[in-house]
């Protein structure tokens, strides 16, 4: 079970939003690359980036910050003899050229959210063009998928869409319960497990992680197909210590950094 720190980018800064509201942003760092280094030093083995301005604008808006983070990650990996630290990014990705540019910059995975729901043909093309590198981000409230930075609720059921996207060849699904994201109310374990059980590709949980108990609860059901969990406000505000939580997850999973790396080869 991987704990994946989230670095949400707004106006070049690292922030956290409450329930996706751009007007409720807390700035945690004016240097996102420094924040990336901090989480790597705390034991992160993968990073999750979100271009918040991009998600609302429908095109990349924080590319300089993304490049700076990727450079910091490369330097850290080289210095510590680590072959690769995967970095994934979502927010405002609506065309194949943008995906190609970001992958060339050094991203491992591209997350497609709103565009996957509104334009499934684009997702299909992306999965074909970049196999194994496309993740679908599904944000849901009460089992229904939300789009456009959570501002619109669609009529689509999460599981129906996820199965369709699995058929397209996406690498995994990030499932965010937007009723809980940034509120630290605990992960919606039941909904996450239900989704994971209906898929053969991995599910990454997101939204609501508050403390070590949430991590332990996810570890207890990880064999249903839950690969990791994205951590945001909890690690920034200190209700969850990333290093000790990842150590605990490794202990419960019977996995250490070495076996995790081997599993990803």
Swiss-Prot record:
This is 1-(5-phosphoribosyl)-5-[(5-phosphoribosylamino)methylideneamino] imidazole-4-carboxamide isomerase. PANTHER family: 1-(5-PHOSPHORIBOSYL)-5-[(5-PHOSPHORIBOSYLAMINO)METHYLIDENEAMINO] IMIDAZOLE-4-CARBOXAMIDE ISOMERASE. One of its GO terms (biological process) is L-tryptophan biosynthetic process. It comes from Herminiimonas arsenicoxydans. The keyword Lipid metabolism does not apply. One of its GO terms (cellular component) is cytoplasm. It is found in: Cytoplasm. Pathway: Amino-acid biosynthesis; L-histidine biosynthesis; L-histidine from 5-phospho-alpha-D-ribose 1-diphosphate: step 4/9. The lineage of its organism: Bacteria, Pseudomonadati, Pseudomonadota, Betaproteobacteria, Burkholderiales. The active site is at 8 (proton acceptor), 139 (proton donor). It catalyses: 1-(5-phospho-beta-D-ribosyl)-5-[(5-phospho-beta-D-ribosylamino)methylideneamino]imidazole-4-carboxamide = 5-[(5-phospho-1-deoxy-D-ribulos-1-ylimino)methylamino]-1-(5-phospho-beta-D-ribosyl)imidazole-4-carboxamide. Pfam families: His_biosynth. Belongs to the HisA/HisF family. NCBIfam families: 1-(5-phosphoribosyl)-5-[(5-phosphoribosylamino)methylideneamino]imidazole-4-carboxamide isomerase. Its main location: cytoplasm. Its EC number is 5.3.1.16. GO terms for molecular function: 1-(5-phosphoribosyl)-5-[(5-phosphoribosylamino)methylideneamino]imidazole-4-carboxamide isomerase activity. CDD domains: HisA (cd04732). SUPFAM superfamilies: Ribulose-phoshate binding barrel. Keywords: Amino-acid biosynthesis, Cytoplasm, Histidine biosynthesis, Isomerase.
């Amino acid at each position: 079970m991987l704990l994946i720190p989230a670095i949400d980018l707004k106006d070049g800064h690292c922030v956290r939003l409450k329930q996706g509201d751009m007007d409720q942003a807390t700035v945690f760092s004016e240097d996102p690359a420094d924040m990336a280094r901090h989480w790597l030093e705390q034991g992160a083995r993968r990073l999750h980036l979100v271009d918040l301005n991009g998600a609302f604008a429908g095109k990349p808006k924080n590319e300089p910050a993304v490049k700076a983070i990727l450079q910091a990650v490369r330097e850290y990996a080289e210095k510590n003899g680590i072959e690769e630290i995967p970095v994934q990014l979502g927010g405002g990705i609506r065309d194949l050229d943008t995906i190609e540019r970001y992958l060339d910059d050094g991203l491992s995975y591209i997350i497609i959210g709103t565009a996957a729901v509104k334009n499934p043909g684009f997702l299909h093309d992306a999965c074909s063009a970049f196999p194994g590198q496309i993740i679908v981000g599904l944000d849901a409230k009460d089992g229904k998928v939300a789009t456009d930075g959570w501002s619109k609720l669609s009529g689509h059921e999460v599981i129906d869409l996820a199965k369709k996207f699995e058929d397209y060849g996406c690498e995994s699904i990030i499932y965010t319960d937007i009723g809980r994201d940034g509120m630290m109310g605990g992960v919606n374990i039941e909904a996450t497990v239900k989704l994971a059980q209906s898929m053969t590709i991995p599910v990454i949980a997101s939204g609501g992680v508050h403390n070590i108990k949430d991590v332990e609860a996810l570890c207890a059901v990880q064999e249903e197909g839950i690969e990791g969990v994205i951590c945001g406000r909890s690690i920034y505000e200190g209700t969850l210590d990333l290093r000790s939580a990842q150590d605990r997850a490794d202990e419960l999973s019977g996995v250490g950094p070495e076996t995790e790396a081997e599993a990803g080869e």
